[in-house]
From Swiss-Prot:
This is CTP synthase. Homotetramer. GO terms for molecular function: ATP binding; CTP synthase activity; glutaminase activity; identical protein binding; metal ion binding. ATP binds at residues 14-19, 71. PROSITE patterns: GATASE_TYPE_1 (PS51273). Belongs to the CTP synthase family. L-glutamine binds at residues 54, 354, 382-385, 405, 461. The lineage of its organism: Bacteria, Bacillati, Mycoplasmatota, Mollicutes, Mycoplasmataceae.
């Protein structure tokens, strides 16, 4: 039978509940336990797929095509497991399923209420995750902050799960902010006390309190929190600011958080083995020389919009003992008169995914600069599309070459809507999830993957128009990755250049500590070799 850990947050949002939950998962996995993780978001969107990156940040795609919260990227990277749609649930998804059931007559004419119908649906998601994953431990993060009106059904649901399963099977971890007042030079615990009281008023007593701060809390402060919050002092854990999120598991392990959990939940675990985490942290420590990458995107004002791309770059850099320095370039600012000057010191150029017309002309100029100057280039999703269109415009002189996403009247639609995709609804209608890409023999990408196939995740609704394949091949473009089932182009490269590679899929979703995705590893290696 699975055990359950629920991670909640108090005082303020944005404390790093996701990193805390991920670190707990990493510690339990390092103790020989099978872990499954999930996130409950209180917002009423069915999923984040239609939300603006400026509102939500990155949409992380699971192997089965779930469009999910960016915290799932942290979960997968920390526990090195592929999660599923079951790992992401929103209030919108819960309410929609309950209302659909009522409309179909599944509720036998009963009055539909938050308790029990909504709370039962939430509990079913937790129990379903336990049944399908067959994990030893299910770790569920509750989004938002205790006291938020939107979170109350989730808090009530996990209270009921504790009642149903017992304290030896359910654990509550509460992440809070420990305030430091610089003026009076003292810590203030009252916000923590009030947060725990708010939890208690909803029927939940935290078993562990994780205190976020920029330094370790003194013993007397821990004693005070312990006394007023009714939590043993051994279960008051410091989570201080780190220069890398990948140091957090080791920091929590030093405070024996895994032992506290294993003891309360009566888990049969092995002695913890943190060898891989220690080795990874040594790579971080030994990385000194910087590599500067020009990151040409359209959502750069909110870096969380590209979270997995950034983490993938860091992980690949550390593999070569290099630090990654990002030079953020808003694609809209690039034009014919300034792009050479702005991009002239680029060691590598990356154009990530995105939707819509804004900024694409600047992205094409970045792609052109990489081609003309033989600078390592990596394009992802939209970054592949604009690279291909740019080649059609510059090398075939098709000046109006475009995607029908940007220009429905183009006479050279290099990219067009995927056949069979719903054109009327944008939610959940993209090509999503892991697909098998067949890699051409002796291509650069096949050498990077050391395989004739790549398993990567997708999120797009436009595809390359095979009508123009021979024309583009005639000017040196190689179509080196194909989804054979539907003959869709997945990877392009320019063999005449040192590293000019772009993929329709998103390789950033499969990067892991100590295991960088081949495209990112190859990109960083090419930059290093190009700058010797």
């Amino acid at each position: 039978m699975a055990k359950f850990i629920f991670v909640t947050g108090g005082v303020v949002s944005g404390l790093g509940k996701g990193i805390t939950a991920s670190s707990i998962g990493a510690l339990l996995k390092a103790s020989g336990l099978k872990v499954f993780m999930q996130k409950f978001d209180p917002y009423l969107n069915v999923d984040p797929g239609t939300m603006s990156p400026y509102q939500h940040g990155e949409v992380f795609v699971t192997k089965d095509g779930g469009e999910t919260d960016l915290d799932l990227g942290h979960y997968e990277r920390f526990i090195d497991e592929e999660l599923t749609k079951l790992s992401s649930t929103t209030s919108g998804k819960i309410y929609l399923s309950v209302i659909k059931g009522e409309r179909k007559g599944d509720t036998s004419g009963k009055t539909i209420q938050v308790v029990p119908h909504i709370t039962d649906a939430i509990k079913n998601k937790v129990y379903q995750a336990a049944k399908q994953s067959q994990a030893d431990v299910i770790i569920s993060e509750i989004g938002g902050t205790v006291g938020d009106i939107e979170s109350q059904p989730f808090i009530e649901a996990i209270r009921q799960i504790r009642l149903e399963q017992g304290k030896e099977n359910v654990m509550f971890v509460h992440v809070v902010l420990l305030l430091w007042l610089a003026a009076s030079k003292e810590y203030k615990t009252k916000p923590i006390q009030n947060s725990v009281k708010a939890m208690a008023s909803l029927g939940i007593q935290p078993d562990v309190i994780v205190c976020r701060s920029d330094s370790s809390s003194p013993k007397d402060i821990k004693e005070k929190i312990s006394l007023f919050c009714n939590v043993p002092i051994t279960n008051i854990i410091d989570a201080i600011d780190q220069d890398s999120i990948y140091r957090v598991p080791l920091a929590l392990a030093k405070q024996n958080l895994q032992d506290i959990i294993i003891e309360q939940l009566q888990l049969k675990a092995n002695a913890i083995d943190l060898t891989s985490w220690k080795q990874f942290n040594k790579k971080i420590d030994s990385s000194s020389q910087e590599i500067e990458i020009s990151f040409v995107g359209k959502y750069i004002e909110l870096q969380d919009a590209y979270l997995s791309v950034l983490e993938s770059l860091k992980i690949a850099g550390w593999e070569f003992n290099k630090k990654i320095k990002i030079r953020w370039i808003q694609a809209e600012t690039l034009n014919e008169s300034n792009y050479n000057e702005i991009l002239k010191n680029s060691q590598g150029i990356l154009v990530p995914g995105g939707f819509g017309k804004r900024g694409i002309e600047g992205m094409m100029l970045a792609s052109r600069y990489a081609r003309d100057n033989d600078i390592p280039y990596l394009g992802i999703c939209l970054g592949m599309q604009i690279a291909t269109i740019s080649i059609a415009r510059d090398l075939l002189n098709w000046t109006d070459a475009d995607s029908t996403e940007f220009n429905k009247n183009t006479t050279h639609p290099i990219f067009d809507y995927i056949k069979g995709i719903d054109r009327d609804n944008i939610g959940g209608t993209l090509r999503l999830g892991t697909m098998v890409t067949k890699l051409e023999k002796d291509s650069l990408v096949s050498k990077l993957y050391n395989s004739d196939v790549a398993l990567e995740r997708h999120r797009h609704r436009y595809e390359f128009n095979n009508k123009y394949k021979k024309d583009l091949e005639s000017v040196g473009l190689r179509f080196s990755g194909i989804y054979e089932e539907k003959n869709l182009v997945e990877v392009i490269e320019m063999p005449s250049l040192k590293f000019f590679v772009a993929s329709q899929f998103h390789p950033e979703f499969t990067s892991r500590p100590n295991k960088p995705t081949p495209l990112f590893k190859g990109f960083i290696k090419a930059i290093i070799e190009n700058n010797k």
